[in-house]
Protein backbone atom coordinates (compact mmCIF):
# COMPACT_ATOMS: atom_id res chain seq x y z
CA UNK A 1 0.00 0.00 0.00
CA UNK A 2 1.36 3.43 -0.90
CA UNK A 3 1.69 6.38 1.42
CA UNK A 4 -1.00 8.30 -0.43
CA UNK A 5 -3.43 5.42 0.00
CA UNK A 6 -2.90 5.68 3.74
CA UNK A 7 -3.40 9.44 3.88
CA UNK A 8 -6.49 11.59 4.02
CA UNK A 9 -8.81 12.27 1.12
CA UNK A 10 -7.35 15.76 0.63
CA UNK A 11 -3.92 14.36 -0.24
CA UNK A 12 -2.85 14.33 -3.91
CA UNK A 13 -3.52 11.23 -5.99
CA UNK A 14 -0.61 8.88 -6.82
CA UNK A 15 -0.56 10.13 -10.42
CA UNK A 16 -0.51 13.75 -9.23
CA UNK A 17 2.48 12.94 -7.02
CA UNK A 18 4.40 11.40 -9.92
CA UNK A 19 3.45 14.24 -12.27
CA UNK A 20 4.68 16.68 -9.63
CA UNK A 21 8.00 14.85 -9.41
CA UNK A 22 8.33 14.99 -13.20
CA UNK A 23 7.78 18.76 -13.17
CA UNK A 24 10.22 19.21 -10.30
CA UNK A 25 13.03 17.41 -12.14
CA UNK A 26 12.46 19.34 -15.38
CA UNK A 27 14.86 22.26 -15.94
CA UNK A 28 14.22 25.36 -18.05
CA UNK A 29 16.82 26.35 -20.70
CA UNK A 30 18.20 29.88 -20.41
CA UNK A 31 20.62 29.82 -23.35
CA UNK A 32 24.39 29.21 -23.49
CA UNK A 33 24.06 25.81 -21.79
CA UNK A 34 22.49 27.31 -18.68
CA UNK A 35 19.33 25.99 -17.06
CA UNK A 36 17.08 26.88 -14.13
CA UNK A 37 15.69 24.34 -11.69
CA UNK A 38 12.66 25.19 -9.56
CA UNK A 39 12.39 24.52 -5.84
CA UNK A 40 9.79 22.58 -3.93
CA UNK A 41 9.03 24.46 -0.69
CA UNK A 42 7.50 22.90 2.38
CA UNK A 43 10.37 20.65 3.45
CA UNK A 44 12.84 21.00 6.30
CA UNK A 45 14.51 24.18 5.04
CA UNK A 46 17.15 22.69 2.74
CA UNK A 47 16.87 21.33 -0.78
CA UNK A 48 16.95 17.53 -1.04
CA UNK A 49 20.28 16.45 -2.54
CA UNK A 50 18.73 13.93 -4.91
CA UNK A 51 16.65 16.73 -6.41
CA UNK A 52 19.79 18.73 -7.23
CA UNK A 53 21.56 15.67 -8.67
CA UNK A 54 18.57 14.83 -10.86
CA UNK A 55 18.14 18.40 -12.11
CA UNK A 56 21.88 18.63 -12.85
CA UNK A 57 21.65 15.38 -14.83
CA UNK A 58 18.68 16.72 -16.78
CA UNK A 59 20.68 19.86 -17.60
CA UNK A 60 23.69 17.81 -18.73
CA UNK A 61 21.47 15.58 -20.88
CA UNK A 62 19.95 18.61 -22.59
CA UNK A 63 23.46 19.53 -23.79
CA UNK A 64 24.11 16.11 -25.42
CA UNK A 65 22.95 14.63 -28.71
CA UNK A 66 19.61 12.83 -28.18
CA UNK A 67 20.99 9.42 -29.20
CA UNK A 68 23.30 9.40 -26.13
CA UNK A 69 22.04 8.53 -22.67
CA UNK A 70 23.74 8.91 -19.30
CA UNK A 71 25.36 5.71 -18.06
CA UNK A 72 27.31 7.02 -15.05
CA UNK A 73 27.69 10.11 -12.93
CA UNK A 74 29.56 11.45 -9.93
CA UNK A 75 28.17 14.28 -7.83
CA UNK A 76 29.83 16.24 -5.05
CA UNK A 77 27.77 18.27 -2.60
CA UNK A 78 29.57 21.51 -1.72
CA UNK A 79 26.97 23.45 0.25
CA UNK A 80 23.43 22.95 1.39
CA UNK A 81 20.79 24.49 -0.87
CA UNK A 82 17.87 26.51 0.48
CA UNK A 83 14.22 26.20 -0.53
CA UNK A 84 13.73 29.92 -1.20
CA UNK A 85 15.82 30.35 -4.37
CA UNK A 86 15.95 28.69 -7.77
CA UNK A 87 19.14 26.86 -8.78
CA UNK A 88 21.15 27.69 -11.89
CA UNK A 89 22.88 24.82 -13.70
CA UNK A 90 25.88 25.67 -15.89
CA UNK A 91 26.95 22.88 -18.28
CA UNK A 92 30.51 22.45 -19.59
CA UNK A 93 30.89 20.35 -22.76
CA UNK A 94 34.12 18.53 -21.91
CA UNK A 95 34.18 15.84 -24.61
CA UNK A 96 32.29 14.46 -27.60
CA UNK A 97 33.65 11.32 -29.27
CA UNK A 98 32.33 8.75 -31.67
CA UNK A 99 30.36 6.92 -28.98
CA UNK A 100 30.84 8.80 -25.70
CA UNK A 101 30.25 12.32 -24.42
CA UNK A 102 31.27 13.88 -21.10
CA UNK A 103 29.62 16.82 -19.39
CA UNK A 104 30.30 18.75 -16.19
CA UNK A 105 27.62 20.71 -14.38
CA UNK A 106 28.04 23.39 -11.74
CA UNK A 107 24.88 23.98 -9.72
CA UNK A 108 24.75 27.48 -8.22
CA UNK A 109 22.33 29.15 -5.86
CA UNK A 110 22.51 32.84 -4.96
CA UNK A 111 25.83 33.07 -6.81
CA UNK A 112 27.56 30.24 -4.92
CA UNK A 113 28.20 26.67 -6.14
CA UNK A 114 26.33 24.02 -4.18
CA UNK A 115 27.08 20.93 -6.30
CA UNK A 116 29.49 19.72 -8.98
CA UNK A 117 28.43 16.85 -11.24
CA UNK A 118 30.33 14.89 -13.88
CA UNK A 119 28.35 12.61 -16.20
CA UNK A 120 29.28 10.28 -19.04
CA UNK A 121 26.93 9.56 -21.94
CA UNK A 122 27.05 6.59 -24.31
CA UNK A 123 25.50 6.00 -27.69
CA UNK A 124 23.39 2.84 -27.61
CA UNK A 125 25.36 0.13 -29.41
CA UNK A 126 26.08 -3.60 -29.04
CA UNK A 127 28.74 -4.63 -26.54
CA UNK A 128 29.61 -6.90 -23.64
CA UNK A 129 27.65 -6.46 -20.42
CA UNK A 130 27.34 -8.02 -16.99
CA UNK A 131 25.67 -7.30 -13.68
CA UNK A 132 25.76 -8.49 -10.08
CA UNK A 133 23.59 -11.41 -9.06
CA UNK A 134 20.23 -10.56 -7.53
CA UNK A 135 20.60 -10.57 -3.72
CA UNK A 136 18.61 -13.09 -1.71
CA UNK A 137 16.00 -10.77 -0.19
CA UNK A 138 12.24 -11.02 0.49
CA UNK A 139 9.84 -10.01 -2.27
CA UNK A 140 8.40 -6.47 -1.96
CA UNK A 141 4.89 -7.75 -1.33
CA UNK A 142 6.20 -9.53 1.78
CA UNK A 143 7.58 -6.31 3.31
CA UNK A 144 5.87 -3.34 4.99
CA UNK A 145 6.00 0.01 3.25
CA UNK A 146 8.10 2.84 4.61
CA UNK A 147 4.99 4.87 5.47
CA UNK A 148 3.81 2.08 7.77
CA UNK A 149 7.23 1.94 9.43
CA UNK A 150 7.24 5.70 9.92
CA UNK A 151 3.84 5.71 11.56
CA UNK A 152 5.09 3.16 14.08
CA UNK A 153 7.85 5.52 15.31
CA UNK A 154 6.30 8.93 14.66
CA UNK A 155 6.09 9.73 18.39
CA UNK A 156 9.89 9.40 18.62
CA UNK A 157 10.53 11.86 15.77
CA UNK A 158 11.16 15.53 16.63
CA UNK A 159 8.02 17.58 16.05
CA UNK A 160 9.62 19.76 13.36
CA UNK A 161 10.29 16.72 11.14
CA UNK A 162 6.96 14.88 11.48
CA UNK A 163 5.03 16.58 8.71
CA UNK A 164 7.92 16.13 6.30
CA UNK A 165 8.25 12.43 7.17
CA UNK A 166 4.58 11.62 6.78
CA UNK A 167 3.63 13.57 3.67
CA UNK A 168 2.74 11.44 0.60
CA UNK A 169 5.60 10.75 -1.80
CA UNK A 170 5.95 9.90 -5.47
CA UNK A 171 8.33 7.02 -4.72
CA UNK A 172 7.38 4.15 -2.44
CA UNK A 173 10.13 2.32 -0.53
CA UNK A 174 9.95 -1.11 1.07
CA UNK A 175 13.17 -1.53 3.06
CA UNK A 176 14.46 -5.05 3.68
CA UNK A 177 16.34 -4.11 6.83
CA UNK A 178 14.18 -2.34 9.40
CA UNK A 179 14.67 1.43 9.42
CA UNK A 180 15.81 2.93 12.71
CA UNK A 181 15.64 6.68 12.19
CA UNK A 182 16.44 7.58 15.79
CA UNK A 183 18.43 4.46 16.72
CA UNK A 184 22.17 4.88 17.34
CA UNK A 185 22.98 1.17 17.28
CA UNK A 186 26.04 0.47 15.12
CA UNK A 187 25.44 -1.80 12.12
CA UNK A 188 27.31 -2.80 8.93
CA UNK A 189 27.00 -0.25 6.08
CA UNK A 190 24.76 -2.33 3.84
CA UNK A 191 21.06 -1.94 3.12
CA UNK A 192 18.56 -3.30 0.61
CA UNK A 193 15.35 -1.59 -0.45
CA UNK A 194 12.65 -2.20 -3.02
CA UNK A 195 11.26 0.96 -4.59
CA UNK A 196 8.93 2.11 -7.35
CA UNK A 197 6.96 5.15 -8.35
CA UNK A 198 3.39 5.12 -7.06
CA UNK A 199 1.97 5.76 -10.56
CA UNK A 200 3.24 5.43 -14.15
CA UNK A 201 6.06 7.59 -15.49
CA UNK A 202 5.90 8.71 -19.09
CA UNK A 203 7.96 6.63 -21.52
CA UNK A 204 11.12 8.75 -21.53
CA UNK A 205 14.56 7.21 -20.79
CA UNK A 206 15.95 10.64 -19.88
CA UNK A 207 13.29 11.08 -17.20
CA UNK A 208 13.81 7.51 -16.00
CA UNK A 209 17.49 8.20 -15.37
CA UNK A 210 16.68 11.44 -13.58
CA UNK A 211 14.27 9.60 -11.28
CA UNK A 212 16.97 7.01 -10.54
CA UNK A 213 19.36 9.85 -9.70
CA UNK A 214 16.71 11.41 -7.45
CA UNK A 215 16.09 8.12 -5.64
CA UNK A 216 19.81 7.34 -5.26
CA UNK A 217 20.17 9.92 -2.48
CA UNK A 218 17.13 8.85 -0.48
CA UNK A 219 18.83 6.15 1.60
CA UNK A 220 22.53 6.88 1.09
CA UNK A 221 23.10 9.01 4.17
CA UNK A 222 21.35 6.57 6.48
CA UNK A 223 23.42 3.67 5.14
CA UNK A 224 26.69 5.59 5.56
CA UNK A 225 25.79 6.47 9.13
CA UNK A 226 25.07 2.91 10.26
CA UNK A 227 28.64 1.86 11.28
CA UNK A 228 29.00 5.04 13.34
CA UNK A 229 25.77 4.84 15.29
CA UNK A 230 24.62 8.18 13.92
CA UNK A 231 21.03 9.15 13.29
CA UNK A 232 19.73 10.85 10.15
CA UNK A 233 19.91 14.53 9.04
CA UNK A 234 23.73 14.83 9.24
CA UNK A 235 26.66 14.89 6.87
CA UNK A 236 28.10 15.63 3.47
CA UNK A 237 29.18 13.00 0.99
CA UNK A 238 29.78 11.98 -2.59
CA UNK A 239 27.18 10.19 -4.69
CA UNK A 240 27.89 7.87 -7.60
CA UNK A 241 25.37 6.20 -9.89
CA UNK A 242 25.59 3.74 -12.75
CA UNK A 243 22.46 3.83 -14.91
CA UNK A 244 21.39 0.52 -16.45
CA UNK A 245 19.72 0.02 -19.81
CA UNK A 246 16.12 -0.50 -18.82
CA UNK A 247 12.93 1.56 -18.94
CA UNK A 248 11.29 2.36 -15.61
CA UNK A 249 7.82 3.64 -16.49
CA UNK A 250 5.84 2.64 -13.45
CA UNK A 251 8.87 0.91 -12.10
CA UNK A 252 8.01 -2.66 -11.39
CA UNK A 253 9.68 -2.74 -8.02
CA UNK A 254 13.46 -2.38 -8.29
CA UNK A 255 15.84 -3.69 -5.65
CA UNK A 256 18.53 -1.26 -4.52
CA UNK A 257 21.51 -2.92 -2.84
CA UNK A 258 23.47 -0.14 -1.19
CA UNK A 259 26.90 -1.06 0.19
CA UNK A 260 29.07 1.79 1.42
CA UNK A 261 32.85 1.61 1.66
CA UNK A 262 35.15 4.09 3.36
CA UNK A 263 33.20 7.38 3.35
CA UNK A 264 36.17 9.70 3.86
CA UNK A 265 37.44 11.60 6.87
CA UNK A 266 34.04 12.28 8.38
CA UNK A 267 30.32 12.11 7.79
Model-assigned labels for residue ranges:
Residues 2-267:
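Terminal targeting signals and extreme-terminal segments of soluble enzymes
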